Each structure stands twice: as C-alpha cells, then as structure tokens.
C-alpha cells in the first residue's frame, strides 16, 4: 500500500521518480482511483512471504522466483525502456554465503545456456556491509562528499543527505573522478561481513566463475546488504549494458 515504508519511500519516491509521485497524488482516470505500477519484484515477494508465513521460525528458507512486466517512470537511459520484463530469484530465511554464490553461479550458467559467451560477460561483485558496519561507513562517505561539494554535481549532493553511496553510481565524469578517492567499503566491513564476502569469493573460485571486485558497485535501496553483483555485456546499445544482478 501507499502507506507502507518500503513502497512509499523506497519504491515510488526513490526509484520511480517525481512523475509517478505526481500520478499517485493526482489520481488517474477517476478522481478517486489510483494507479500503482511495480518497479521490481522483490517487495512483492517479501510481502507474500510475510503474509503467508512461508519461512516459519526455525524452518527451511524459501527459494522463490518471479517473472513479469515491470515499470519505471523516470526518463530511461539509452537502451532502457520504461516497461520491461524481469525474471528474478529470491531466497529468504538464510544468510549463508553459499546462497549468494548459488544465485551468482546460477545466473552465469543461465546466460551461457542461452548462448551468451562467457568471455563477453563481466561479473562485478562487491559487499555493501550490514546494519552494523554500513552506517559508520555511510557517514564517512557523506563527510568526504561534503569536503568536495564544489566538485560534485547537484544530484550527488542531494544524494549525500539521503543515501551518499549512490554517488558511486553517478555517470558524471567529474563526480566519478572525485569518488575514485572516496573511502572504500572493503576497508570498513565488520568481521562478520568480511568473512561472508571472502567465503562468497571462495565459492566462486571453486566453481570456476571469474569475477571482478568493484567497490563502486552499490544499490540505492536500504534493504540491500552484503553481497551485490552485476553482469555486464557489450551489447552496442549504449550506456545500458547491465543484463542482470
């Protein structure tokens, strides 16, 4: 619903932009009707798991998948559409590094199965830490950005107040240059997150899956913790070269 935090704050405002917010506030066909289009599948999966108690306390984790059309209201980058189809997998009720490695290995094997050559793909990985170590790191990045405010774009400085880690994803060349020298999350992980990240890499190594560590790889929603990953391929379509993650 509109009143729930994960939908109102993160999905509509942060992801879908002001255009969708105005649409929600102003109504649609009738004065009392509202239109809500899902930007991705994770929130719906989490809601279903909570509603139907699919992960009872002490029970086995729930491994689920979804597929269907998703929608984004912001102006799309080159090669990206406002409506697109997305396939995703979710595992809830487990924190082991084997789960993250399993998802990554499964994705890479899927791409190879449908004919994408392994040598044409780049697998990028990073750890975003957890609720124990990320807040302090986020403050370090915010302080760094404030020290370099005159070198960063307006969007980045707005993000500095809400989620400074998003500045690592800025496409502005000047901002990218400044953020190259920003504090790196790998230097500020707590012992548990460091052990988790090292285990994920060990499993990928054992499976023969090549990867590159990219400290600039972040996600804009607060529910992302620890391992994040992205698969890129040179598709000749412009800036949108990420095909999964």
Please state what every model-predicted region is.
Residues 1-245:
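TRNA-recognition modules of translation machinery and tRNA-sensing kinases, especially anticodon-binding
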């Amino acid at each position: 619903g509109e009143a729930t935090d994960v939908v109102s704050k993160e999905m509509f405002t942060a992801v879908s932009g002001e255009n969708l917010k105005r649409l929600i506030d102003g109504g649609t066909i009738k004065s009392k009707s509202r239109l809500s289009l899902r930007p991705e599948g994770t929130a719906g999966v989490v809601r279903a798991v909570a509603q139907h108690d699919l992960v009872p306390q002490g029970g086995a984790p729930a491994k689920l998948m979804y597929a269907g059309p998703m929608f984004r209201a912001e102006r799309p980058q080159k090669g990206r559409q406002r409506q697109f189809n997305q396939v995703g997998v979710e595992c809830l009720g487990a924190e082991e590094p084997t789960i993250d490695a399993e998802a990554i290995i499964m994705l890479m094997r899927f791409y190879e199965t449908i004919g994408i050559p392994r040598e044409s793909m780049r697998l990028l990985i990073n750890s975003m830490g957890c609720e124990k170590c990320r807040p302090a790191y986020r403050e370090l990045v915010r302080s760094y950005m404030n020290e370099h405010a005159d070198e960063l774009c307006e969007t980045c400085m707005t993000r500095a107040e809400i989620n400074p880690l998003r500045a690592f994803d800025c496409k502005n060349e000047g901002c990218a240059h400044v953020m190259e020298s920003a504090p790196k999350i790998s230097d500020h992980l707590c012992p548990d997150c460091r052990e988790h990240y090292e285990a994920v890499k060990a499993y990928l190594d054992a499976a023969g899956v090549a990867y590159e560590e990219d400290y600039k790889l972040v996600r804009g929603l607060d529910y992302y913790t620890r391992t994040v990953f992205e698969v890129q391929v040179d598709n000749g379509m412009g800036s949108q070269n990420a095909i999964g993650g």
